[in-house]
């Protein structure tokens, strides 16, 4: 893969670091999501030399989907924070918002495109970009969301930050016994506890 377009599932990658990275600022604020995202993105850029980096952010798409199906994502467990103390629990939501705001601002100073489409989940935006805008371009989707496996084809791969590996259509077929073109249909029959 030479100079692919890299499309990052912003909140998915941020939350991995927010929950796992206990980094603190000099003021005592938790900054693990911010620090981990920036460091991780730097490593990915070194490894894949993308021609373009796009970060897709969530913007309330869940509300739209929940109006159609109230149980949408109701099976999700709350984020498990890797902390050595419990004092930050009431401030977690505020800190999360603060870190995302700092991250968006920092990324706006870099040669990175950020996309936020009103009433759309990042997954939907990523799917549109990979299938329609960059369909004839090599792409790497950065996310641990298996729903995005449906986008994997000859031109598109998925990098899983948790597994630290690039996933292609052969890897999906080998692991699940399902082609990427049938992955979503199979998940409909099997079910998805995270949704």
PLM region descriptions:
Residues 172:
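Surface-exposed, charge/polar-rich loops and edge strands
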Residues 177-178:
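Conserved catalytic alpha/beta core of Sir2/sirtuin-type deacylases, generalized to analogous enzyme cores
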């Amino acid at each position: 893969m030479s100079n692919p377009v890299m499309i990052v599932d912003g909140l998915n990658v941020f939350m991995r670091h927010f929950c796992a990275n206990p980094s603190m600022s000099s003021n005592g604020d938790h900054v693990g999501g911010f620090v981990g995202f920036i460091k991780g993105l730097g490593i990915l850029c070194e490894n894949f030399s993308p021609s373009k980096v796009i970060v897709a952010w969530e913007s309330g798409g869940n509300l739209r989907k929940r109006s159609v199906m109230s149980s949408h994502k109701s099976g999700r467990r709350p984020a498990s924070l890797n902390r050595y103390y419990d004092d930050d629990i009431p401030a977690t939501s505020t800190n999360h918002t603060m870190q995302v705001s700092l991250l968006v601002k920092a990324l706006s100073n870099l040669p990175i495109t950020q996309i936020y489409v009103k009433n759309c989940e990042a997954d939907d935006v990523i799917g549109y970009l990979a299938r329609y805008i960059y369909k004839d371009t090599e792409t790497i989707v950065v996310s641990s969301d298996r729903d995005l496996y449906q986008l994997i084809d000859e031109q598109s791969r998925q990098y899983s930050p948790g597994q630290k590996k690039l996933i292609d259509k052969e890897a999906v077929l080998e692991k699940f016994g399902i082609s990427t073109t049938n992955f979503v249909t199979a998940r409909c029959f099997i079910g998805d506890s995270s949704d």
